[in-house]
Amino acid sequence: MARKCFFTGKGPMVGNNVSHANNKTKKRSLPNLRSIRLKLEDGTSVRVKVAASTLRTIKKYS
């Protein structure tokens, strides 16, 4: 489950670098992932990778 958000499923996207001469080469843009530790209701903690935008939402509602 590398390079993928645990909650939203956001993953790498593929696009093009376009030069002034209109030459196109492939590029990959990776999500801004952060590794966080979530505490579960039973007291244990789990380490998951989440996108930074998801982390903002988690902090907003917790």
Swiss-Prot record:
InterPro entries, alphabetized: Bacterial_rp_bL28, Ribosomal_bL28, Ribosomal_bL28/bL31-like_sf, Ribosomal_bL28_bact-type, Ribosomal_bL28_sf
This protein's record includes keyword Repeat: no
Pfam (any one): Ribosomal_L28
Keyword field: Ribonucleoprotein, Ribosomal protein
One Gene Ontology molecular-function label: structural constituent of ribosome
Top-rank taxon, per record: Bacteria
Keyword Ribosomal protein: yes
GO cellular component terms, semicolon-separated: ribonucleoprotein complex; ribosome
GO biological process: translation
Family: Belongs to the bacterial ribosomal protein bL28 family.
NCBIfam families found in the cross-reference section: L28 (TIGR00009)
Protein name per its UniProtKB record: Large ribosomal subunit protein bL28
Protein species of origin: Helicobacter hepaticus (strain ATCC 51449 / 3B1)
Gene coding for it: rpmB
